[in-house]
From Swiss-Prot:
InterPro entries: Aminotransferase_I/II_large, HisP_aminotrans, HistidinolP_aminotransfase, PyrdxlP-dep_Trfase, PyrdxlP-dep_Trfase_major, PyrdxlP-dep_Trfase_small. NCBIfam families: hisC. Its EC number is 2.6.1.9. It holds the Pfam family Aminotran_1_2. Homodimer. Its cofactor is pyridoxal 5'-phosphate. This is Histidinol-phosphate aminotransferase. It comes from Campylobacter jejuni subsp. jejuni serotype O:6 (strain 81116 / NCTC 11828). The lineage of its organism: Bacteria, Pseudomonadati, Campylobacterota, Epsilonproteobacteria, Campylobacterales.
Length: 364
C-alpha cells in the first residue's frame, strides 16, 4: 500500500520509555523514571479526589463548551473565555496552529534544538523548516533568518523555557522580538515550563493577557502535564485573540478532551500547596545536579525547567543511557537531537540520590 509521500521524510517521535517495560527488559525490581519531565510527586491530591468523585461519569461525553475550565483559566490569566482553546495536551493546539498557517508553499522558524513535534507536525503540511545555527534561542539569529525569509515564514516557534535544553529568555527580549514580526506571521510561545521559569526568575515570566493585548499574532501555550501532574490525562490550552481561537475551532474535533481531564484540571489549578511543594523541591534539588556536574566536569546550560541537560565531550550519551537503564534509571538520551547529551528530570530527593550514586559509579 502506498501512503502520502511526506511520510517518507518523517521519523517517529521517541517518547520516554515506560517503567514496566524497563523492569521486564532489564530484570530490575525498582525503576526510577527521570525521562519525561513528569511531576515527581504524582497527581495533585485535589485532582485525585475530583477524579474519585467523577469516575462514575466516565460514560458521559464532556461539556463541549468546556466552560468550567475556560472560566477558571480566564480568571487565572485575566483574559476572556473567547481567548482560550482547550486541547488534548498543548500538542494538539500546536497542531491547530500548524494546520491553520502552514502549507507546502511556506515555512516556519525555530531554534536549532527544540521540541521535536514542531517539525514533525509541520512536515505533514509540507512546510519548509528554518533553524538557527545556535542550539538555544538566540533572538539575533531568529531575527536574521526571519528578515532573510520573511515572505516565506508564516509561523515562529519560541519554546520558553526550551525543551530539551532548559534555557529561557527575559520577557522583555521576547516582546521586543515580536514587535519586528509581521502581523500575518503567527508567533507561538510554548510556555509548557513557564511556571518553573517564573518561580526561578520573575524577569522570565510571560503574561498571556499582556501578550495578546499588545499583539494580534501571538499564541501562548500552557499544559497540565508538568507542574500540575496530569500528563496521563492529556490536557493543555492555548490563549490568543478571538480571531485565532475561532480559526482553530474549525480544526478541532468535538469532545476532544475527556470530562475527567476537564474536571481534574480545574481541581489541579486550585491545589496551591501541591504546586508550591513541586516548585520548591525542583530548584532545591536542581542545585544538587549542578554540584554533581561541577564535580565531574560535565557541561550544563542553566535550566529554568524541571529538568537539566548534561553535555559530554568524551563519554558517549547512548552508552551512558544504556548503563543507567541496567541500573533501573530511565533518562532521556538526546542523540536523536544530534547532541551527545542526556536530559534528566528532577525527581524526589530519593530518586535524585539514587541517580547520583549510580551515575557516579558509571562515570568512574
Amino acid at each position: 500500500m502506498k501512503f502520502n509521500e511526506f511520510l517518507n521524510h518523517l521519523s517517529n517521535y521517541e517518547p520516554g520509555k515506560d517503567i514496566e517495560v524497563i523492569a521486564k527488559e532489564y530484570g530490575v525490581k525498582e525503576v526510577i523514571k527521570l525521562a519525561s519531565n513528569e511531576n515527581p510527586f504524582g497527581t495533585p491530591p485535589k485532582a485525585i479526589e475530583c477524579l474519585r468523585q467523577n469516575a462514575n461519569k466516565a460514560h458521559l461525553y464532556p461539556d463541549d463548551s468546556m466552560i468550567e475550565l475556560k472560566s477558571t483559566l480566564a480568571q487565572k490569566y485575566k483574559v476572556q473565555n473567547e481567548n482560550i482553546i482547550i486541547g488534548a495536551g498543548s500538542d494538539q493546539v500546536i497542531e491547530f496552529a500548524i494546520h491553520a498557517k502552514l502549507n507546502s508553499k511556506n515555512a516556519f522558524l525555530q531554534a536549532g534544538v527544540t521540541f521535536a513535534m514542531y517539525e514533525i507536525y509541520a512536515k505533514q503540511c509540507g512546510a519548509k523548516c528554518y533553524k538557527t545555527q545556535s542550539i538555544t534561542h538566540d533572538l539575533n539569529e531568529f531575527k536574521k533568518l526571519y528578515e532573510a525569509h520573511k515572505d516565506e515564514i508564516k509561523l515562529i516557534f519560541l519554546c520558553l523555557p526550551n525543551n530539551p535544553l532548559g534555557e529561557c529568555l527575559d520577557a522583555s527580549e521576547v516582546t521586543k522580538f515580536i514587535k519586528g514580526v509581521d502581523e500575518d506571521c503567527l508567533v507561538v510561545i510554548d510556555a509548557a515550563y513557564n511556571e518553573f521559569a517564573s518561580f526561578k526568575d520573575s524577569k522570565k515570566h510571560l503574561e498571556p493577557c499582556e501578550l495578546i493585548k499588545e499583539f494580534d499574532n501571538v499564541l501562548y501555550l500552557g499544559t497540565f502535564s508538568k507542574l500540575y501532574g496530569l500528563g496521563g490525562l492529556r490536557i493543555g490550552y492555548g490563549i490568543a485573540n478571538a480571531n485565532i481561537i475561532n480559526a482553530f475551532y474549525k480544526l478541532r474535533a468535538p469532545f476532544n478532551v475527556s470530562n475527567l481531564a476537564l474536571k481534574a484540571a480545574v481541581a489541579a489549578i486550585d491545589d496551591d500547596e501541591f504546586t508550591k511543594k513541586t516548585l520548591e523541591n525542583n530548584f532545591s534539588q536542581m542545585q544538587l545536579y549542578k554540584e554533581f556536574a561541577k564535580k565531574h566536569n560535565i557541561k550544563i546550560i542553566d535550566s529554568y525547567t524541571n529538568f537539566i541537560t548534561y553535555f559530554f565531550d568524551e563519554k558517549n550519551s547512548t552508552d551512558l543511557s544504556e548503563k543507567l537503564l541496567k541500573k533501573g534509571i530511565i533518562i532521556r538520551n538526546l542523540k536523536s537531537y544530534g547532541l551527545n547529551a542526556i536530559r534528566i528530570t528532577i525527581g524526589t530527593s530519593y530518586e535524585n540520590e539514587k541517580f547520583f550514586t549510580e551515575f557516579d559509579k558509571i562515570l568512574r
